[in-house]
Amino acid sequence: MKEFWVWVEPFDRKIVSVALEAGANAVVIPEKGRVEEVKKVGRITVIAPDGDLKLGEDVVYVLIKGKEDEERAAKYPPNVKVIVETTDWTVIPLENLIAQREELYAVVKNAQEAEVALQTLEKGVKGVVLKSRDINEIKKVGQIVSEHEEKLELVTIKITKILPLGLGDRVCVDTISLLHRGEGMLVGNSSGGMFLVHAETEENPYVAARPFRVNAGAVHMYIRVPNNRTKYLCELKAGDKVMVYDYKGRGRVTYVGRAKVERRPMLLIEGRYENKKLSCILQNAETIRLTKPDGTPISVSELKEGDEVLGYVEEAGRHFGMKVEETIIEK
């Protein structure tokens, strides 16, 4: 996920507060002795000579004036985060640096520059560092960064089998965000084939809507989390990051507020996309819904063979939640 840092020089408590409210991941403070003042404002990563991340060690700043500086920025060890700045990105193309290293953060002066930095070479920089004391600009950049989240190509899965099972343990994921119609989480028996399980945004005569919730399914299943990784549903706990996707494949990060494991009657659902078979095990209840290609939810109690729902397919296998190229057969 993209990161948003705010450069605070000279130190200004109000700018730190605005950065925190705008969703900044960190503040960069070149001055020593300000860490405690920042922590009084709120919990945020401080990048400073005496900060959570040490400026000059964990994070380095490079002013790019020519090819020599560009080469120096590219040569830092992979674990070092590099902040780069230049007076004119049209003279020193950002593409060159993005192609050479992952942990790259570009200094920007406004929202327009942030937009360009995040989109360069499709993948863009790891994050932007805003050098501006304009409160509105800080808020604008925060909004832009939050919108530049993961985008997946969702596929249409044709349902081939629906089989009621006995009781099993399922995980209900309550997030700290309100989800909308057409949004949900990607889960599946295999990380290579997942279904978009819809959030509980719909009301019915018996149960009120719970738009913060996704009843995600059986404890053994995979769920997609940030940075192209997966977790088992049973691993989720309060404070964990999870991905929420809409029916167009646009992803955003939210956090688990509570993960409830309860014993419930379960349902095996199988489907096919081209020559690939996918499956998931969900609770057998009217409130559990998958997502149609147009974004409307469909209850598992109404689902039938031949229906089409949304999902995601990838070819690589997983090793400790990370994508790897290897042969894995899951049945």
Curated annotation (Swiss-Prot):
GO terms for biological process: amino acid biosynthetic process; aromatic amino acid family biosynthetic process. Coiled coil: none annotated. One of its GO terms (molecular function) is oxidoreductase activity, acting on the CH-NH2 group of donors, NAD or NADP as acceptor. It comes from the Bacteria. Its EC number is 1.4.1.-. Keywords: Amino-acid biosynthesis, Aromatic amino acid biosynthesis, NAD, Oxidoreductase. It is an enzyme of class 1 (oxidoreductase). It holds the Pfam family DHQS. Belongs to the archaeal-type DHQ synthase family. NCBIfam families: PRK02290.1-5. This is 3-dehydroquinate synthase homolog. It comes from Aquifex aeolicus (strain VF5).
